[in-house]
Amino acid sequence: MSVVILVEDDEAVREVLVEALGDAGVRVLDADCPNKALLLVSSTPECMAVVTDIDLRARIDGFAVAERALEMNSDLAIIYISGQREHWLRRTMKSWERSITKPFDPGELVEVLRELESPAERPLA
């Protein structure tokens, strides 16, 4: 079973995603803020991915959360979620990164996680 850390400040969105991922057999550790998310990353070496909203209404955004998480565990896959497409226009995604624009079907997130979980689909950077 995959372990994923979900960082989403909107409680309703977080609950829907936790349920959908759980139904797909993913163990989800959720956080409503960057600090909690980074504590989870540091204490969960078996984590395979971080799913993070970009606009977290905090001092740091989802891109910074991902950067700090990768400093702790360079094997992580990162999935960014946001309602603002312009986030993707100013960023070149690496092989271990994906982006999903809100609103989206939770099944899309499950598919992206499965894709990133497959070593054949995740070439070295």
Feature-to-residue mapping (PLM):
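Conserved phosphotransfer cores of two-component systems
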Residues: 42-45, 58, 68-75, 91-92
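C-terminal output helix
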Residues: 104-117, 121-124
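Conserved acidic carboxylate
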Residues: 8
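As written
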Residues: 91-101
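Conserved phosphotransfer microenvironments
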Residues: 53-67
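Acidic, metal-coordinating helix/loop segments flanking the phosphotransfer/catalytic sites
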Residues: 30-49, 89
